[in-house]
């Protein structure tokens, strides 16, 4: 029983020790105008479709451009998340930092040292992959110790590091097992533990949770947050899942077609998306978009007309438009589902009529899909704020009125750029 009481205390002590600043393992990472081109594998065919290819910004005479004009300064101990759809260049960028992909142009610095031509083993980084990459014939202990053995680290030091990492990750009881005897979450912990024992300057994680089911993803996401707090070093994390990006990152980098679309804290990106793509990509359910018109009254105040209904703008948005001397123009109006409110039938304020298509009961909220003059709109309504008759949902074909305040509207110009960014 004495041992049982001491084990948790020992684990907490190790976690506290791991959380202490370790300046030798901290590193600033700088990517300057990074570009990655995959040369064409076969000669270009001068055919009728060659003109069509030029419409794809990722295909040039050099080849397929996976990443371009990538500029990012990552501070010591910062947790950066690269997020975007498949094929946006996020994993390629991570692999260039790791040295697994050659940099076509630009400069990469880690801890102030140019790394373009430095071999991966000499970059003092550790990478965790999506598929765990564990040796099936080795035990958990042997998997975690393998890189240290290659470095000729003493047996005592290897044993200390492996057991400390195992206690931090709560996998001590699995050290003698083979990977096939572990669950997906346990295997991922082993993969992370193998990276921890190396005590790298930079942790790289390439979609480490993609192979896990929803419940395990939520659990491991929390574990990664705790891990970051304990080992306190620089992280670069790649994911296509915006929930992971929002919950894990100090800052997130949204990518599309090899270009950075926006860099900011999760809240900054959510509150002020730089363009239509970011606005639609970040947030679940995604932002609603309306064809609209930005108007200017005789007194100089701006307002927005949507489906023939006028909506005023908040004072801070008015001022931003005045500062830019914005002219009346056709725009795309964006409003997040949780920022749309229902109005009474006899409401005097501006509102839009719609018919209910689908009502999804989510427990604490209802996701209401409506059709407003041919436009599909999604509302997220807190059940606690709804009248009793609507707390169990809405019926197909019900008529509802909805509106949105002047402080929650996002205005995008004809090029898709946020006019208030």
Question: Where would I find each of the regions flagged by the language model?
Answer:
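ABC ATPase nucleotide-binding domains
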Residues: 120-281
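Non-catalytic connector elements of ABC transporters
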Residues: 287, 296-421
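Pre-Walker A (P-loop) beta-loop-beta motif of ABC nucleotide-binding domains
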Residues: 70-81
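Conserved ABC transporter NBD signature motif
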Residues: 106-114
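Helix-to-loop junction immediately C-terminal to a conserved catalytic motif
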Residues: 98
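Conserved coupling/switch loops of ABC nucleotide-binding domains, chiefly the family-specific signature
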Residues: 104-107, 157, 257, 409
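The feature captures the beta-strand-to-loop junction immediately N-terminal to the Walker
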Residues: 83-85
């Amino acid at each position: 029983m004495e041992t049982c009481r001491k084990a948790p205390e020992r684990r907490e002590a190790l976690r506290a020790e791991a959380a202490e600043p370790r300046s030798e393992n901290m590193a600033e990472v700088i990517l300057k105008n990074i570009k990655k081109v995959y040369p064409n594998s076969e000669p270009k065919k001068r055919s009728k479709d060659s003109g069509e290819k030029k419409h794809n910004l990722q295909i040039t005479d050099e080849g397929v451009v996976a990443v371009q004009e990538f500029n990012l300064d990552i501070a010591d101990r910062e947790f950066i998340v690269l997020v975007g759809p498949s094929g946006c260049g996020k994993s390629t960028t991570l692999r260039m930092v790791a040295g697994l992909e050659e940099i076509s142009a630009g400069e990469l610095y880690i801890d102030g040292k140019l790394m373009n031509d430095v071999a991966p083993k000499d970059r003092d980084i550790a990478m965790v992959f999506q598929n765990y990459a564990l040796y099936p014939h080795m035990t958990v202990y042997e998997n975690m110790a393998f890189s240290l053995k290659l470095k000729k680290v003493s047996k005592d030091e290897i044993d200390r590091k492996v057991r400390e990492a195992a206690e931090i990750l709560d996998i001590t009881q699995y050290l003698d097992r083979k990977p096939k005897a572990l669950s997906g979450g346990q295997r991922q912990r082993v993969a992370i533990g193998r990276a921890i024992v190396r005590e790298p300057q930079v942790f790289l994680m390439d979609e480490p949770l993609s192979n896990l089911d929803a419940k395990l993803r939520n659990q491991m996401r929390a574990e990664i947050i705790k891990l970051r707090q304990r080992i306190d070093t620089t992280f670069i994390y790649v994911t296509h899942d915006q929930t992971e990006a929002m919950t894990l990152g100090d800052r997130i980098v949204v990518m599309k077609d090899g270009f950075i679309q926006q860099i900011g804290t999760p809240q900054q990106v959510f509150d002020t998306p730089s363009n239509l793509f970011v606005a639609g990509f970040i947030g679940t359910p995604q932002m609603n978009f309306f064809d609209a018109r930005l108007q200017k009254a005789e007194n100089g105040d701006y307002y927005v007309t949507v489906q023939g209904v006028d909506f005023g703008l908040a004072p801070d948005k008015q001022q931003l438009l005045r500062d830019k001397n914005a002219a009346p123009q056709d725009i795309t109006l964006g409003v997040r589902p949780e920022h749309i409110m229902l109005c009474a039938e006899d409401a005097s304020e501006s509102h839009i009529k719609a018919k209910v298509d689908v009502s999804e009961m989510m427990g604490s909220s209802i996701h209401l899909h409506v059709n407003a003059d041919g436009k599909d709109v999604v509302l997220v309504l807190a059940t606690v704020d709804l009248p009793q008759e609507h707390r169990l949902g809405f019926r197909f074909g019900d008529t509802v009125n909805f509106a949105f305040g002047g402080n929650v509207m996002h205005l995008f110009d004809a090029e898709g750029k946020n006019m208030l960014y």
